[in-house]
Regions:
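C-terminal hydrophobic helical "lid"/dimerization subdomain
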Residues: 1-9, 253-257, 297-356
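Glycine-rich cofactor phosphate-binding loops and adjacent beta1-alpha1 units
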Residues: 166, 210-288, 328, 351-353
């Protein structure tokens, strides 16, 4: 089937249930007014996917259809979509705003009061042969990016947004807590802004070594009793900005402890439960705690630029590509420390010359 043909009948779709992950049959959805039908090519397994599969995600209930990091091809367009045509290679913003609430009208669709999310509790997800989505959430992938690079646009947009909320890090000292895919993507994005120094914390030695290879000035064992002191020593001072990509109680305390007076702690990770804050330190040191939720279109545009310019290279992050039939194995790989970014091959490459 070519991208220009209209599919019909049934398709494959991944469903994550308690203690199992299956590929099941489902009807091919039809695009409504203002929507496009996308044929999935590659879908990334996110940390939120593995946490949800383990029953640890606060906002995703089982069973659910996963997949929000995706590169695909427009297969069909609904009425009222003049700007896209079948055959275009695309990625999507998976957040699904109402467009009418106070936050949406302010241009903050990422924190819409009625937000849905493709692949995170929505009836559809990108780990399927096809899915429909609002055409306003679709971004055309430039020809310079191969499919693997395009699959990183969505996850890279999360740290790009966090950097924006921190008012950038040029000339500032930075601590990044966590060296998973988001923490390491954040490292590369931060380095592009010219920080004074960047230190990464991670419990596993191989992740600390990887952070150093990707440009960190130092890497500290997150489990060390004196981790906060080590970060300060490596920075030469307390951190102007701390990005917590783990969001556990331990990292929250570390982040506040290593932040400079008047500094900023950006919460990038998704906490799995309630966390107690050392609020007396926050007040006394005038520390700003800044939440960071997904991203906006300008962050997607910046992510595309970071990838096209080579600041972020897919070869540094994509460690496995698994066929759709091996989705359970892909989730196991993504949850293991041996892998950074695991992709699921839903279909053949969008363009064989750009398969990556």
């Amino acid at each position: 089937m070519t991208a220009q043909q209209t599919p019909s009948g049934t398709m494959r779709q991944v469903v994550v249930s308690a203690e199992r992950i299956d590929v099941v049959g489902a009807d091919v959805p039809r695009p409504g007014v203002g929507e496009v039908l996308v044929r999935s090519v590659l879908a990334g397994v996110c940390g939120s996917d593995t946490h949800a599969a383990a029953g640890l995600h606060p906002w995703i209930s089982l069973p659910y259809v996963p997949g929000h990091e995706v590169v695909g091809v427009v297969s069909e367009v609904g009425a009222g979509v003049p700007s896209l045509e079948p055959g275009r290679r695309v990625t999507v913003e998976p957040s699904l705003p109402c467009w009418n609430c106070k936050q949406c009208l302010r241009g903050q669709q990422n924190i819409c009061e009625n937000l849905g999310f493709l692949g995170c509790g929505d009836p559809q997800g990108a780990m399927a042969d096809y899915f429909t989505v609002d055409a306003r959430r679709v971004h055309v992938v430039p020809d310079e990016l191969d499919d693997r690079a395009a699959a990183l646009i969505e996850p890279l947009s999360t740290p790009v947004h966090a950097l924006r909320l921190a008012d950038g890090v040029s000339g500032r000292t930075v601590a990044i807590l966590g060296a998973g895919s988001i923490g390491l993507l954040l490292l590369r994005a931060a380095l592009s802004q010219g920080p004074k120094r960047v230190v990464v914390t991670a419990p596993r030695a191989e992740r600390r070594e990887l952070a150093l290879a990707l440009g960190a000035d130092a890497a500290v064992d997150a489990y060390a009793d004196d981790a906060v002191e080590q970060v300060r020593a490596a920075l030469g001072e307390s951190a102007d900005v701390v990005f917590d990509c783990v969001a556990s109680e331990a990292t929250t305390r570390q982040a506040i402890g290593m932040a400079d007076k008047g500094g900023t702690v950006v919460v990038v990770g998704v906490p799995s439960g309630e966390i107690q804050l050392p609020l007396q330190l926050v007040q006394d040191r005038q520390i700003r705690i800044q939440g960071s939720a997904t991203y906006l279109p300008e962050d997607v545009a910046d992510s595309i630029e970071l990838l096209t310019s080579g600041v972020v290279r897919p070869g540094d992050f994509v460690t496995s590509v698994v066929p759709m039939e091996g989705v359970a194995e892909a989730f196991e790989q993504a949850a293991s420390p041996q892998h950074i970014k695991v992709l699921i091959a839903i279909d053949g490459p969008a363009d064989p010359d750009r398969a990556g």
